Swiss-Prot record:
GO terms for cellular component: cytosol. Belongs to the NAD-dependent DNA ligase family. LigA subfamily. GO terms for molecular function: DNA binding; DNA ligase (NAD+) activity; metal ion binding. This is DNA ligase. Keywords: DNA damage, DNA repair, DNA replication, Ligase, Magnesium, Manganese, Metal-binding, NAD, Zinc. It comes from Clostridium botulinum (strain Alaska E43 / Type E3). It is an enzyme of class 6 (ligase). The lineage of its organism: Bacteria, Bacillati, Bacillota, Clostridia, Eubacteriales. SMART domains: BRCT (SM00292), HhH1 (SM00278), LIGANc (SM00532).
Amino acid sequence: MVDKIERIKELVEILNKYSYDYYVLDNPSVSDKDYDKKYDELKLLEKETGVVLPYSPTLRIGDIVLDGFNKYTHKGKLWSLDKAQSLDEIKDWHNRNIKFVNDMRAQGEDLPDLKYIATKKFDGLTVNLTYNEEGMLEVSATRGNGEIGENVTAQVKTIKSIPLKLQENHDLFEVHGEAIMTQEAFEKYNSSADSPLKNLRNGAAGALRNLNVKETARRDLSAFFYDVGYKEGYQFKTYLEMMDFIKEKGLPVDDYLKVCVSIEDIKNEIDYIEKIRFDLNYDIDGLVIAIDDIRTRELLGYTVKFPKWAIAYKFEAQEATTKLVDVEWNVGRSGRIGPTAILEPVELAGVTVKRATLNNMDDIKRKGVRIGADVFIRRSNDVIPEIMGTLENTLENSEEIFPPTECPACGSHVVLNGAHYFCENTLSCKPQLVKTIVHYASRDAMNIAGFSEKTAEQLFEKLNIKSISDLYKLKKEDLINLEKFGDKKAENLLNAVEGSKECKLYSFIYALGIPNVGVKTAKDIVNKFKSIDGLKNATFEELVSVQDVGDIVAQDIIEFFKEEKVISTIDELLSLGVNPIFDEVKIVESIFKDKTVVATGTLQNYSRTEIKTKLESLGAKVSGSVSKKTDYVIAGESAGSKLTKAEELGVEVISEEEFEKMLGRES
């Protein structure tokens, strides 16, 4: 029995370390298989012995339903923040701070020059965690009225990035943070939820106030911590010192934390965060600006509601409510008929929104969307916002939305395949054929210069072009009769079509429009199979062995090449002179092999395409965004937010000259 308890302690310590590496450091130190093996061993030992340590990772699964919430009195008050919605309001606050510091100095106080710390204002639910002298998570509570909150310890324990026991601790302390739901967790939850969540904030708040803790665990929340509200023993001298303390304790802290010493600095940070806010995987609604020096904070004090030493700059809302006027059904390249919401115009994040995404009929039903009702809309980084839900008190006199019974473009029969409706008329449905031809001619595909959707529509309507192979049968005398086509434009288009015959194999594969096969996947499968015939005859097992090709993509490829129409089109293209060439990339041994590299800014000796090709020839994985998993950022002139993010994350940044020197050392 004693040996089993010792093993339980050992496994708990090991598994908590693995969780810290994965969820806080974003640096997994063990495979999922090895983690699961140890986790299963721990569960078995706990069942056999009846011993479950209060910081065991098995407590995170939430196998309990509570009767209600108990009240908890915070040791340190959780204050609200005063809000500013313009830079002028920030300036007024800053000027008051300058005057105060000068007045205090005149009275003999030795205060440092003003220094502010800027952090993101997370849009979730505030939580207050209490760790005791032994480092155990004793209580977790909501903010409540700032003095008394609700005990949500069981719910907070489901957040995997929050340590249940600190590695080392001597003083009892309370730490404030924000429980949030990431976009990824939100989408995963909504994909199978009976009642989909309307937004990320409600997802987090609802999870922590759910008495069924298993439901909380399903939401897969995250958290960031940013303030120590109460601490026994040593007291901090600066906010930066406080943040270092939080980080050292193993609590998750956001990477963004900027020192500002002037209004110009603050403005730059506001501009930067507004620029990247829609690229984030979670919601923020502003920027918090706080004085760094704790003594200055103490002297400034508080109003009835707010600390005088901090202010929150609020961004324009990402969400709004408006009326759904109608639903429009549109046909895509694959024949899929998708719904688009037509809205009463509404201002959202500085943009007038008139349309929004509705994914399919299942999405419409789950969200309870009806014509004439008011809907929540959310704008992220997409051009078109998405409908998140419906205001239930506006459903009276609203109309049900019905799926299409025929193709809205050609009137043909429609079929339901999975969650989506499709037009079966692949031979003459205008939107399908026009979009197929436009995709085939696009830059990343066959790169037929000067080819537009307007041109494709004219070719379909006036010249009866119904297949991508028909492009290679065009004649000048046909083209010059089209609107805005003269001799020169006709010749240029014919030359571009002719020039496209000599193409790279991956471009040709991408141009064919295989479902779920983008440029990168096309390159990956071409490097594996090296020819059209090789790909046509590939087995499911061979396809899923290619990096980033999963079961769905593999099945899509197999089904695509089963179509007689596809095979006959490919054969006709080849007979018309299209000659896809496979250029085998020879990977040279390099320091960049298997490294993730991002290039940003203007490079002197490489275009975007050239640096990408060069890096791929060195065996690098080229990414378009910077994360903790990025190994190098090559920064050229006028490098912007990617460079800033790399510096924040501690990613190695090299210049173009340094990049070439690194290559030179290897040759």
